[in-house]
């Protein structure tokens, strides 16, 4: 048997096992009928024309540069006029990539360096701000963007802690009052196959939803070893993906995509989480490289979530939502309870399940379209709830305890320093260990 067929068989076995286990629980565990939790979107292939939209980018790393190229592809008359970052070499690389790939030149006097550089972007007569810094900074920068009455695209997640989530929610409400457009980086909501699958599930294609299963198991992403001459802050910023206070840990920074998909399809957030995790092979930073979390929903249903960033293991990025009449992978296919395909996404001129529309671009097409048609869309609340759900799972794993949604929402724990400068960072950078130690000889066997 080839590795591919062996893996396919394993996934099929896992699916059957999961469905059988959930079915044994019975109808009493049903979550609810899938309700629309997000306004239906009529996709367009390109945003309409209009007056020049002046865009400023905050965070010139790979994702920020990518988001800038994506919005330039979204429609006509879009111009990048300002850039901000704390690292000059990141700024220089971004400018070089924009010049090479999009023939974009940003004037020197509109390229700002420093922790307060985002404020200078907001003061530079932009219409739109793209926020792509490490997520620790998102709440503060989003609040300032809304206060400046600028439309905002912000990458996921919305925050790294509960105070940050509450800030995103408050700023989101203010954005609604100002009739601003806010789009988040939870891109599957802007992916055409996902959207059509969601529409069908909303209309009862799999019956009432019982449970879900999510996987984001991949290899290690990247890390940046500290170099001589770097301060604590510079070393952490350059290695931000591996530090809890900057990224939120990978269940928050990456697996939030799966978590958001399940919240979207079920139309509700969990009531509590239990879980575990650990650190087996991560090289830098202070966070885990694997999590297993079970989220419990109001009517007894569960979402079994697993994520891992370790090389040399079996990779899988998938979602499964199970209903009383079938199940779906959420992205392009619906099955009956026997595993027979009853529907698969089909786009004209494309293979089944495939789309020619890149969701990284589509989210910006939708964003610009909302701005130019004066039909504000605001995704702040849903990215905030998905972020808090991820944080809930993280803290359940860190502590080994059952943590309630309301308890997490009210948490006062804030990650990271309160002042930002290229120097020492006064935080307790220790990898979390759940439970209590086997101390005082309580577990010592004497004979």
Can you annotate each of these PLM segments?
Residues 4-25:
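N-terminal secretory signal peptides and thylakoid transit peptides that target proteins
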Residues 26-102, 262, 442-447:
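N-terminal Rossmann-like dinucleotide-binding module
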Residues 59, 63-64, 176-184, 188-285, ...:
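Predominantly a Rossmann-like dinucleotide-binding segment in NAD(P)-dependent oxidoreductases
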Residues 81, 98, 271-447:
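Glycine-enriched catalytic-core subsegment of oxygenase/oxidase enzymes
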Residues 102-131:
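A structured beta-alpha segment of the ubiquitous adenosine-cofactor-binding alpha/beta core
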Residues 135, 139-190, 204:
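Beta-strand-loop-alpha-helix segment that lines the small-molecule cofactor/substrate pocket
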């Amino acid at each position: 048997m080839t590795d591919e067929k062996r893996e396919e068989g394993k996934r099929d076995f896992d699916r059957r096992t999961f469905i059988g286990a959930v079915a044994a629980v019975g109808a009493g565990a049903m979550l609810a009928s899938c309700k629309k939790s997000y306004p239906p979107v009529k996709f367009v292939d390109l945003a309409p024309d209009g007056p020049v939209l002046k865009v400023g980018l905050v965070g010139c790393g790979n994702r920020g540069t990518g988001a800038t190229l994506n919005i330039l592809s979204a429609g006509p008359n879009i111009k990048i006029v300002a850039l901000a970052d704390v690292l000059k070499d990141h700024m220089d690389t971004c400018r070089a990539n924009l010049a090479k790939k999009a023939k974009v030149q940003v004037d020197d006097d509109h390229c700002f360096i420093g922790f307060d550089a985002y404020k200078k972007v907001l003061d530079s007569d932009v219409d739109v701000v793209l926020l792509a810094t490490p997520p620790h900074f998102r709440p503060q920068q989003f609040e300032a963007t809304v206060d400046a009455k600028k439309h905002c695209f912000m990458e996921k997640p919305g925050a790294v802690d509960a105070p940050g989530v509450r800030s995103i929610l408050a700023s989101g409400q203010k954005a609604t009052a100002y009739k601003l457009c806010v789009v988040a980086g939870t891109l599957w909501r802007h992916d055409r196959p996902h959207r059509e699958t969601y529409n069908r599930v909303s209309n009862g294609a799999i019956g009432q939803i019982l449970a879900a299963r999510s996987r984001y198991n991949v290899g290690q992403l990247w890390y940046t070893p500290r170099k001589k001459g770097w301060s604590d802050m510079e070393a952490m910023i350059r290695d931000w993906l591996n530090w809890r206070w900057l990224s939120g840990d990978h269940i928050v920074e990456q697996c939030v995509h799966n978590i958001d998909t399940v919240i979207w399809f079920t139309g509700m957030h969990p009531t509590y989480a239990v879980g575990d995790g650990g650190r087996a092979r991560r090289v830098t930073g202070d966070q885990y490289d694997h999590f297993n979390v079970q989220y419990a929903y109001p009517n007894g249903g569960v979402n079994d979530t697993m994520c891992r960033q370790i090389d040399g293991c079996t990779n899988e990025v998938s979602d499964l939502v199970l209903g009383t009449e079938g199940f779906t992978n959420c992205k392009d296919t619906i099955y009956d309870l026997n595993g027979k395909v009853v529907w698969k996404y089909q786009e004209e001129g494309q293979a089944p399940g495939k789309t020619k529309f890149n969701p990284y671009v589509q989210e910006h097409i939708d964003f610009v379209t909302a701005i130019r048609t004066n039909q504000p869309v605001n995704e702040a609340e849903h990215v905030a709830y998905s972020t808090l759900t991820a944080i809930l799972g993280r803290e359940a794993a860190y502590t080994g305890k059952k943590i309630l949604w309301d308890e997490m929402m009210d948490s006062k724990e804030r990650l990271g320093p309160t002042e930002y400068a290229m120097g020492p960072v006064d935080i307790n950078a220790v990898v979390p260990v759940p439970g209590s130690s086997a101390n005082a000889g309580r577990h010592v066997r004497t004979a």
